[in-house]
Amino acid sequence: MKHLVIATRGSKLALWQAEHIKSLIETEHAGKVDVSLKIIKTKGDIILDVPLAKVGGKGLFVKEIEEALLDGSADLAVHSMKDVPMELPEGLFLGCIPEREEPSDTLLSVRYASLDALPHGARVGTSSLRRQSQLLALRPDLDIISLRGNVDTRLRKLMDGEFDAIVMATAGLKRLGLAAPHHEVLAPPRFLPAVGQGALGIEFREDRADLRDMLAFLDHRPTRIRVEAERGFLAGLEGGCQVPIAGHAVMTGDDNFRIEGLVADLKGERVIRRTLEGTGANARNRGLELASQVLADGAAEILDEVYASGAADRQ
């Protein structure tokens, strides 16, 4: 029987995702493959007292995991796609992108049913500049406060009354079966998600032809098209997942998609949104074209200001 090792972070959500892929592999190749998990701490897991946007560097949640792939101590890695940098280390590639979970965000609150129901000056917790910008574009009166930690930690702080509301990825809440007394899904087009949000990426070495064949069943072409378009947009902006950039692609036919991209300033006062359509064969290039449009329409100036303010490090 063939044995595979999945490298993963140790958070509840990361472990759920790795266990999910483990189960799919062992079911598809029943009696032929068994899978174990190798838990690895990343820089992003260790540095918890600094907002993510200020930690700096690429691959905050993947670098140490990729090192395990390169040194052979793990066969494959399961990542949240929104954490995966645009450029992968030489010798590694994203072999599979499974079917995507809902990419939206969710507002959670103990007392208030929706974003519109929050009182003036309400304290809203999020570690994401993308969420901050879009929240302030809709509600300039809100007091946005940095909130780091795993899903459980953030929910506990909400339940303990430290915040009137918090915003988290819908996919993580659904995967872990978590909720709060009140919640509102903040979905496109009103509120755009991070590039790749809700999708998983299976990374392994390019020279592992055995894994290409064995794991091909995991790849979901519509999800790959959407994610490649979104990642093209982010690459064209030379941005990371900690910058006020959002991208969301949807399939409009068997091989056709539409992508909407957004760049905003930190206060949500200037928001640039543009849309393009494309086909699977040119997904990444259409994302790059959308980035060029957005940059020409003022996003370059906005991003320069964000980096100059020190709110985020240029990737």
Curated annotation (Swiss-Prot):
Gene Ontology molecular function: any one: hydroxymethylbilane synthase activity
PROSITE patterns named in the record: PORPHOBILINOGEN_DEAM
UniProt name for this protein: Porphobilinogen deaminase
Pathway the protein takes part in: Porphyrin-containing compound metabolism; protoporphyrin-IX biosynthesis; coproporphyrinogen-III from 5-aminolevulinate: step 2/4
EC number: 2.5.1.61
Catalytic activities: 4 porphobilinogen + H2O = hydroxymethylbilane + 4 NH4(+)
Function: Tetrapolymerization of the monopyrrole PBG into the hydroxymethylbilane pre-uroporphyrinogen in several discrete steps.
Family annotation (CDD domains): PBP2_EcHMBS_like
